[in-house]
Amino acid sequence: MTQTLSQLENRDAFIERHIGPDAQQQQEMLKTVGADSLNALIGQIVPQDIQLATPPQVGDATTEFAALAELKAIASRNKRFKSYIGMGYTAVQLPPVIQRNMLENPGWYTAYTPYQPEVSQGRLESLLNFQQVTLDLTGLDIASASLLDEATAAAEAMAMAKRVSKLKSANRFFVAADVHPQTLDVVRTRAETFGFDVIVDDADKVLDHQDVFGVLLQQVGTTGEIHDYSKLIAELKARKVIVSVAADFMALVLLTAPGKQGADIVFGSAQRFGVPMGYGGPHAAFFAAKDEFKRSMPGRIIGVSKDAAGNTALRMAMQTREQHIRREKANSNICTSQVLLANIASLYAVFHGPAGLKRIAGRIHRLTDILADGLQKKGLKLRHAHYFDTLCVEVADKAAVLARAEALQINLRSDIHGAVGITLDEATTREDVLNLFRAIVGDDHGLDIDTLDKDVALDSRSIPAAMLRDDAILTHPVFNRYHSETEMMRYMHALERKDLALNQAMIPLGSCTMKLNAAAEMIPITWPEFAELHPFCPVEQAEGYQQMIAQLSDWLVKLTGYDAVCMQPNSGAQGEYAGLLAIRHYHESRNEGHRDICLIPSSAHGTNPASAQMAGMQVVVVACDKNGNIDLADLREKAEQAGANLSCIMVTYPSTHGVYEETIREVCEIVHQFGGQVYLDGANMNAQVGITSPGFIGADVSHLNLHKTFCIPHGGGGPGMGSIGVKAHLAPFVPGHSVVQIEGMLTRQGAVSAAPFGSASILPISWMYIRMMGAEGLKQASQNAILNANYIATRLKDAYPVLYTGRDGRVAHECILDIRPLKEETGISELDIAKRLIDFGFHAPTMSFPVAGTLMVEPTESESKVELDRFIDAMLAIRAEIDRVKAGEWPLEDNPLVNAPHTQGELVGEWNHPYSRELAVFPAGLHNKYWPTVKRLDDVYGDRNLFCSCVPMSEYQ
């Protein structure tokens, strides 16, 4: 029969490209698991009472090219003005060699957080470089591998200051009046739940205030003034007050390091090291502290360790500090950071080197001096005599200045009484400065750049002599070698080859949803229409963003069954925190602020109790039964005990144990019966979309991991987006923003992130995914994720017991393989299996979560049967190797598992093992072999000998 035009147009072609198994493979897999069809399989697994009767109304699928054209038309509604607003956001020039070979390279952006260091040495090295940049510029002893943004870093600094303070009775945190307003906003939000009293005053009045445990100063104030705080810091230190300083990476190239002036903590945004503004993000924050506080640092820290052969190797150090270990004792819920963006900043520093950075910073400052000199020659007054890149200019007719600026497509900072703010950047040119003269003075300004340049070159005093940096920065060879594009390209490629990402193999991490990040989804993030907008630009310049965000929000509302969505939280953990704050403020609005007990099942992700703790709640753990389900009797008992103090329950669905609990609606009803709210963790939404929804189940609020379910890549450990969906009664209590209040912002509550829409520039990825998949495609994705997991469970259950199953022995979208019986029999652990998988070319599944001694496997819908079979074959081969150990053929202390992974170096060295080299390094054959560059890491050595800065280049030879 002749095909119709509609069939030939193939508008749902992307569905088949996103979903790994084709129709024939699906049938083969269904036969293996014993189901007649996808719908029949879902009917056996998902409780009937929560299955949607009709699909969410998010439209039909469309092609990649049609979706790109549609989004391009939306993006074109954004107006690309020159933004000199500043406030922590500036235009940048991302080196094309970094954009092409790193930002747009799936070898970098599809990797996972480097929990498996043996397959992560490349980005770990780049993150170590980032830490070295931070250490050199801040003058402190230890640095983290990035935080979410500058404002949340400020909140983390406050929390850390309280942790390490010796003034245990003090409960006040002082913030200098000239910090960025969005920073103050987030600090106030965090302080409220911690019970801290935030004092805002001029910095020189800080000594007038008593009972202060910590102080936040900003080296270059929000309106541009450079501060020499050395004397003040000394006085504060004499009082045992912890001093945090917000700083600017580019300014620090020229200015003295706050650490040298005595600061305990220094943080800020690394955005201007090559990361586009992106209407607010994503951007990496840097964070550094004195060595004595290293065990209280928030976020990830990369450390230098040794591998089993004694060679230098890198790893994430001191992971016992993290929230998933400390749980309800945590005071930070940092999980995802901003690895991809930190690595852009790191490589920017490598590419430019110290000389290049000084040239860029010097040019920015020289142009600022020229602008200042010209304006003063025209009789205008500057508020501050000392500045780096920002001027605060007093103007008589502010409206006229802003009107001229708008006509020239220029944005100035307009919220300063009687003045305008102007922040220059590395993209600013001579012509831009002339246009600024036209905007502020008028067309007949009569000023000449070269003449002004000569004047300021002779007499520039805008940076006080005491504030000029007098020490060398970035002296390590890595920052002084790769300055030609050829060298830089090869360096980035060398780093990439050390790592295992989705462009090499399936990453079967349970609870992580490492699905396809399609090229068509990624293309829009570098469009200048999205990349170049300042987050605080006038709303009429961001109509494209507003339309895109509104459409995406509407789709997410329909997919979740909620009434509203807030896009501000820029990680899943931030989403949890924001959702719990909404619950807290809702109770307070009803004069029930005493409701502070949060029930959390024992199987929960570690961020759940950490977020509850941060939101000012008491955590009460609810037991799970032998099948891994919430124990309803224990839940009812705990809810009754909490009574009028019950705030909420945090529950994951499908459960963290990988099953659809039949009683989920009853769980919701019990909590609601006692006046509590239901927080449904969205970590496992990839098994819900199109099949059921949190709102339909009965939940009140969820965060959505757009970097899991909706295809934003993990970036090697960030960025993420933790947008929250809420029922109508909670909508007035989601985060707001102090700087930007526009239509679409649901609330006037405090902010949890620096920018109003979080990491806005990666939202087009999720928009593209939903638009190309349509309602039917999204449902098929969930169905195939479930099919793939059940296929793996079915084929592996005889070799590795599946710990938890639901009705009919099925699992949801992931399964937990119980390694404990094998370890008891043979001594081989889940760690040995994880490391041996590297020799087969796979990243390990999630280890020992949510149950110690297990492996949790989540294949996602994007992996084909061919790749699933390759993984299954590897796991079965490993089981056969375990049996050989059990039989005594290989000793427990010397076999392919305990010695894994094996490196190329072992091919040419001495060989004294009872198994062959071929079995060691080519267990899956010769084709497309992945080579780890280090052997198994020595975690104990790394934590006992903490070293978190760049090592000599000879160590990498």
From Swiss-Prot:
Which co-factors does it depend on? pyridoxal 5'-phosphate
Task: For this UniProt record, give its keywords in alphabetical order, as a comma-separated list.
Answer: Oxidoreductase, Pyridoxal phosphate
Q: Provide a GO CC annotation, any one.
A: cytosol
N6-(pyridoxal phosphate)lysine carried by residues: K708
Query: What Pfam families is this protein classified in?
Result: GcvP2_C, GDC-P
What does the record list as GO biological process?
Answer: glycine decarboxylation via glycine cleavage system
- Which SUPFAM superfamilies did the record assign? PLP-dependent transferases (SSF53383)
EC class, as a word, reads oxidoreductase
Cite a single GO MF annotation.
Answer: glycine binding
Its Enzyme Commission number(s) read 1.4.4.2
The highest taxon in the source lineage is Bacteria
Catalysed reaction(s) here are: N(6)-[(R)-lipoyl]-L-lysyl-[glycine-cleavage complex H protein] + glycine + H(+) = N(6)-[(R)-S(8)-aminomethyldihydrolipoyl]-L-lysyl-[glycine-cleavage complex H protein] + CO2
Keyword Electron transport part of the UniProt annotation? no
Record note on quaternary structure: The glycine cleavage system is composed of four proteins: P, T, L and H.
General function of this protein: The glycine cleavage system catalyzes the degradation of glycine. The P protein binds the alpha-amino group of glycine through its pyridoxal phosphate cofactor; CO(2) is released and the remaining methylamine moiety is then transferred to the lipoamide cofactor of the H protein.
HAMAP family referenced in this protein's UniProt entry, alphabetically: GcvP
Q: Report the sequence similarity comment from the record.
A: Belongs to the GcvP family.
Name of the protein in its database record: Glycine dehydrogenase (decarboxylating)
Q: Which gene encodes it?
A: gcvP
